[in-house]
């Protein structure tokens, strides 16, 4: 089933020049970028995005971190996109993530963990409008007929 997922490359990914390498990994798995922005997340966006964590002790630090520098926000599309990206991302705690996953290869711990990915269709429905208008999602097809 084709579905969409929101992916954020967090400030540590941007500052460490990992954008291209991470997007390549996602595309190499057959996921298609249908929206992409390089942006500075506002405090309001961060608080809305992480609203499920509002009552947790780390909420304030999470908002401070995610707004500490630019991010890359993107919508990816493909078969089982949510599951595929979650597997590629690896464990939330980078120190426990398996080698070969994005966090396993690039993250040092749980706080600066490189990437966010929607964990369910419901999460995507909440998260996507924080970063994109529906009109910013681009429907397109691969040009395989031109290449092959």
From Swiss-Prot:
Gene3D superfamilies: Nucleoside diphosphate kinase-like domain (3.30.70.141)
UniProt keyword Phosphoprotein, yes or no: yes
UniProt subcellular location: Cytoplasm
GO cellular component: cytoplasm
Keywords: ATP-binding, Cytoplasm, Kinase, Magnesium, Metal-binding, Nucleotide metabolism, Nucleotide-binding, Phosphoprotein, Transferase
Name recorded for this polypeptide: Nucleoside diphosphate kinase
Main location: cytoplasm
Record function comment: Major role in the synthesis of nucleoside triphosphates other than ATP. The ATP gamma phosphate is transferred to the NDP beta phosphate via a ping-pong mechanism, using a phosphorylated active-site intermediate.
GO molecular function list: ATP binding; metal ion binding; nucleoside diphosphate kinase activity
Cofactor(s) needed by this chain: Mg(2+)
SMART domains per the UniProt record, alphabetical: NDK
An individual GO BP term: UTP biosynthetic process
Pfam families: NDK (PF00334)
Species this chain originates from: Thermoplasma acidophilum (strain ATCC 25905 / DSM 1728 / JCM 9062 / NBRC 15155 / AMRC-C165)
UniProt catalytic activity: a 2'-deoxyribonucleoside 5'-diphosphate + ATP = a 2'-deoxyribonucleoside 5'-triphosphate + ADP; a ribonucleoside 5'-diphosphate + ATP = a ribonucleoside 5'-triphosphate + ADP
Domain of life: Archaea
Stated family: Belongs to the NDK family.
Active site: 116
